[in-house]
Amino acid sequence: MDARELSELEHAFVAAQESSAPPLAANFRFPDGFLWGAATSAHQVEGHNVHNDWWAWEQAGRVATPSGAACDHWNRFRSDFDLAQSLGHNAHRFSIEWSRIEPEEGIWDETAIEHYREVLLALRERGIEPVVTLFHYTMPKWMAARGGWEDPKIERYLARYAEHVLGRLGPHVRWWITLNEPVVHVFKGWLLGQWPPGRTRAWATALKVLRLMMRAHVRLYHVIHAFRPDARVGIAQHALALSPDDPRRWSDRWSVKVRGHLFNHLFIEALHTGALRVPGLFWERLPIARTLDFIGVNYYTRDFVRNSGYTLAGLVGDAEAERDHRQQRGKLNDLGWEVYPEGLAQFLREYSRYKIPILITENGIPTQRDDDRWVFLFMHLWQVARAIADGVDCVGYLHWSLIDNFEWADGYKARFGLIEVDFETQERRIRPSAWRYAEIIRRNEL
């Protein structure tokens, strides 16, 4: 990237980084075969996913704005992929909607399966590598009625769904993600009550659900490899940078360690080593080791943690309080999250200890100001480049998101897209930041 094109903020960022670390080589080149692209998820873009638990949650008035038609991506995927191709993307992450494949228990919608086959063929025809998520937060209403993630049989139902999908779609997909952000799902659904099933402070149930999610991942891992031995199978792990609310307070520093382990390492460590542990609290051996071929990293921001006692909930910090964002030191995005690029390199280095490839499966900013999007993107890619230069095996970067979409409880106010969507007309417009990202992709270098 020509230095003359850099904004004042970018220059300041680069200067700050260079002052505290060895300089990054000019015109840093990313590895050959690096995956460049963006990501979406079914419920957030397809529209009218009427058979899942999130649709029921919305219709019950649990969110201010329901998903409705979303981006109508179900009908517009080809033209959306044309835009991705025009931007030079060589990879695209999306999810298959379980409730479309199996809208009623044991009843398979072959039309939906064929639709996703056409999605995969459309990507392949455009030279775009699919990265497919099997479970991105939503489940069929019938599964939710059985107890959802609290039902010990869910791994069996997920495996049956995966077998049906792999039987038809397996030849077209090498990269698979079993679960998206399982720990976030547990926090939002069983501790904060903000997402289905709407439990609050249900710590014992939350730990049970985490175990079931781990077992489900293992079952899915083996199903995928049975159909496609050369598959690359991982999860998308939400990585949340954490700092103590008061660095002088020992209890806050300890809470950062506990919450950091629970949120950022517990799931991956368990799948890699077979040990489910929280230091000083519990340890359990599970038959789940060595079931990650890569680690997907979703990274957005940093939180500040204040200890609120010496129970597990207290050690994690006040997970229900908005104070986590009160003391942010950096620039805030439209959802009040701090822009903290250093955290991405931190996690790339931390996760490299597992000695398996890392794919950045989400990284983006909700903002109406596209200049901020470009600065965010550049600063985070700078951190990726620095980590790779230090020897981290990072194989790709997928920006969140390709298009503006339905952002769960935040509705449509969070504009993450490289491509702007007018939700009244469904018109698309490529943002300037997307073209600047395209130039990095074209050159495969910063």
Locations of the language-model features?
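Active-site region of glycoside hydrolase catalytic domains
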Residues: D2-G61, Q85, E105, E114-R373, ...
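Active-site-adjacent substrate/metal-binding segments within catalytic domains
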Residues: E46-Y116
